[in-house]
Amino acid sequence: MFSSAEVNEQDAPAYRYAYLEVEGPYSKLGSKQAEVQALLKLQKVNYTYPITLMMSDPRVTQYKQRVARIGFLLSSNANVAEPLKLDTIPARHVISVSIKAHPLFAYGKTYGALVKYCEQHGMGLQLPTVEIVEHSKLTVQMPLGKE
């Protein structure tokens, strides 16, 4: 049996994260995430779940021009050193799409449900989307309220 994506409108909390920016094909995100994790371990920084900010829509952006931030969530008092960067996403109102599925299926199902929601509500995809993987559950959040 296949899982269905769950779509909700909700208030998302603020997130503090360490990251590296990636330009080019999104297929490189996995190796960049491993690099961020290794740097955090080397710097002895405690981290929790993986986070990705998709800054470009792959449906309309050539693969060499795509931009993403990939990293890990941190506590409010953690600090990092170069080459890692630190940022905070403020609390905001979002459309949240979640699914617990194998990664090969999870991303397609969540973004498919998000695009369908946007079409049904007469809106376009708002960027950046935030992806968080927690206990094998992928959650994609799209910001609302700035149209």
Residue map of PLM features:
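A solvent-exposed interaction/effector surface
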Residues: M1-E147
